[in-house]
């Protein structure tokens, strides 16, 4: 788990906007790209119609929530909603019982994906900056994420660092 308490804002050369339901097919495509090219084990979902349907349904539910935002970058900024995307990122804010500092609001960043030909052009950084700014505006005092080794550099440049004494544990429930 990597965490950050603050970050810088925006990149003037990349136009980031909040996703709408019209973007769902492209968000699903970018999620498949993320899993098929970025995960440390083989995943093949881009042609799995059942997965694509379930992912689109989940995206529709999430986009309707006030505590969730997905930010995107269009191939052609003039095309707007529903056009081809080159990148996206999701962020959700959750309320927890507060610790000794803060209000107990934290954010979790996920599904950062940039099309392969567009990587290294600041798109990931711009998406990350917008996601952190939105989480901060919602009152989150902390943001966390999980990263593969290949994605770690962009997060570390934004101030994320390996978490302290707590270790992330997980378990399948179904």
Regions found by a protein language model. Give the residues of each.
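Conserved hydrophobic beta-strand within the GNAT/NAT acetyltransferase core sheet
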Residues: 109, 142-145
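Conserved beta-strand in the GNAT
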Residues: 72, 82-93, 108, 113
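A conserved beta-turn-beta hairpin within the catalytic core of GNAT-like acetyltransferases
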Residues: 95-109, 119
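A short helix-loop-beta-strand connector motif used in the catalytic cores of GNAT acetyltransferases and
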Residues: 57-72, 108
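Conserved acetyl-CoA pyrophosphate-binding loop and the N-cap/start of the following alpha-helix
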Residues: 118-130
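Conserved GNAT-fold acetyl-CoA-binding loop/helix
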Residues: 32-58
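Conserved active-site alpha-helix within GNAT-family acetyltransferase domains
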Residues: 125, 137-138, 149-171
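A short beta-loop-alpha structural element at the N-terminal edge
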Residues: 15-29, 40
């Amino acid at each position: 788990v990597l965490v950050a308490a603050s970050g810088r804002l925006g990149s003037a050369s990349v136009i980031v906007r909040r996703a709408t339901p019209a973007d769902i097919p492209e968000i699903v495509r970018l999620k498949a790209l993320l899993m098929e090219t970025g995960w440390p084990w083989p995943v093949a979902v881009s042609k799995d119609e059942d997965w694509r349907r379930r992912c689109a349904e989940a995206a529709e539910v999430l986009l309707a929530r006030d505590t969730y935002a997905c930010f995107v970058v269009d191939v052609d900024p003039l095309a707007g909603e529903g056009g081809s995307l080159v990148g996206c990122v999701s962020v959700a804010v959750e309320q927890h019982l507060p610790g000794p500092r803060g209000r107990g609001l934290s954010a979790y960043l996920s599904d950062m994906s940039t099309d392969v030909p567009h990587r290294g052009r600041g798109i990931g950084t711009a998406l990350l900056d917008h996601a952190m700014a939105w989480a901060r505006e919602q009152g989150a005092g902390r943001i966390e994420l999980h990263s593969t080794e290949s994605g770690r550099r962009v997060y570390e440049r934004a101030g994320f660092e390996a978490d302290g004494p707590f270790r992330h544990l997980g378990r399948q429930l179904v």
